[in-house]
Amino acid sequence: MAEDKELVATVGPVTWDGLKQELMALPKETLAELVNVWLTTYWTLQNYWMVYTEQCFGFESAAKLDELIWSKLVPAQAYRIIKVLNLGHDLQSLATLLKFTAPQWIGAGFAWEFTEVSDRRLAMVVHQCPMGTYRKAQNLELLPCRQLAPPLYIGLAKIINNKIEVTCLHAHPDPAKENVMCEWEFVLKD
C-alpha cells in the first residue's frame, strides 16, 4: 500500500497544502485505509473518554458531558461533510451524511443498514456499535441510547432539512432485541 509511494519528511513547515499533496499521491486504497485509521482512533478515544469520565465522575456527569460535546461536534462535522460532498436537502442527502459521518463509521465497529430509503422515509437499524460492544466486553451497563442518541440524529436530520422528523423506534433501555442495538426512522414532512 504506502510502500508504492515513498513518503519522505523534509526540513521546513508542515502545511495543509503540502500534506494534501502527499495524501493525493497515495494509492486510493491506502488513503481509504488511512481515513479508517483516523475514524477508528476517534471511536477509541470516545470509548475511553466515556468510560474513564464515568469512573471518575459518575454516569450522570459523563452522560451530560458527552451530550454537550456531541451537540457541538455533530453540526460541525455535518456542515463540513455537506460542503465537501455538496449534499442537498432530501433524505438521500441525509443517508449519505449518515454513511460518511464519524458517529456511524463502519470501520470503527458499527454494523448497520438502511431498511428503507424513499423520498419520504428513511429507516435504519444499528446491529452493533463500538460503545455497546466495548461496554458489553467490560461488563458495563449499556448506555441509555433512547435518551442519549436522539440529539445526535435530530441534529444531523435538521441540518439537512428542518422538515425531517426523527423517531427512535428501539434503543436501550428498551427490552433487548436480537441483533438490534437501535432502530431509527426519518420522515420528511410536507
Where are these regions (language model features)?
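ATP phosphate-binding glycine-rich loop and adjacent ATP-lid/helix-beta elements
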Residues: 151-152
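N-terminal accessory segment detector
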Residues: 1-122, 130-132, 136-148, 158-159, ...
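Surface-exposed charge patches
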Residues: 155
